[in-house]
Amino acid sequence: MFFKNLQVYRFTRPLEQDIDTLERNLEEFKFKPCGSQDISKLGWVFPMGKSGSMYTHIAGKQILICLKKEEKMLPAGVIKDQLNERVEAIELEQGRALKKKEKDSLKEEIVMQLLPRAFSRTSQTFAWIDSESDMLYVDASSTRKAEELISLLRKTLGSLPIVPIQLKNQADVIMTDWLTEGNIPANFALEDEAELCSALEGGGIIRCKQQDLLSDEIKNHLSADKFVTKLALCWADSISFIIGEEFALKRIKFADVLQEQNEDIDKDDFAARFDADFALMTGEIKQLIPAVLAAFGGEQSL
């Protein structure tokens, strides 16, 4: 139970629901599989999967929830081919060109006919509510995926007073200064990956991997017209990640020595290991995020 990505949000006021109420509300919007005519379905599942019996997993004031999504797979090419065949046949029969509205209606019919036979794929997105610090963390690689969970959570709770974390300073300017000056914040270390974007429209993007980010080559790019928009960092020799200009952490990796702290727990005891890993992860992230915020000059006041 270790998040691989972090989309970070701040509660503008404390979450007012107690655990029992939250549990009931989540159950009301529990996951139900797609019916024959459903394109997709969203709902809450037990964070511990088959080993769980609750829609929340609690460790102190830390609450873990899990969204499940099922999507029917309808290849666009198949729909397009069938639509073209039907349009061609009808136009030939009626001796006229079909209007856009008629084509759209035909397309909808084709989708409805294909849905019952379509394969489906499922995915899960975890979120962690830190009721102690009034934060919400979503393990999602994109804002769009995080918003999917947030939208259902807002519907589930009736309201969800959160805003994305906002920095006082521009992240790209701060990261550019770090590489230009070689002045990395204490307790952080550069890794070997970055993305540099031109300040000029259409000026290009440079993606660096396995690169010395303090080299003259990188500095030459920065002294021209480039800004650092993504940067690989390691904090306290414990957690490595890539941070972007929108304050999202991706490709998070917890050091082996950190994860091995729970190796003494019997692997067959899934519940105990899950609980210990969640407690370990939340404890580390609750130290990491304030350190990252401080490195970037602090959080903008609400």
UniProtKB/Swiss-Prot annotation:
Annotated family: Belongs to the RdgC family.
General function of this protein: May be involved in recombination.
Cellular component per GO, a single term: cytoplasm
InterPro entries assigned to the protein according to its UniProt record, in alphabetical order: RdgC
Pfam family, one: RdgC
GO biological process terms held by the UniProt record: DNA recombination; regulation of DNA recombination
Subcellular location: Cytoplasm, Nucleoid
Keywords, sorted A to Z: Cytoplasm, DNA recombination
GO molecular function, a single term: double-stranded DNA binding
Origin: domain of life: Bacteria
Protein's name according to its UniProt entry: Recombination-associated protein RdgC
Organism: Psychromonas ingrahamii (strain DSM 17664 / CCUG 51855 / 37)
Main location: cytoplasm
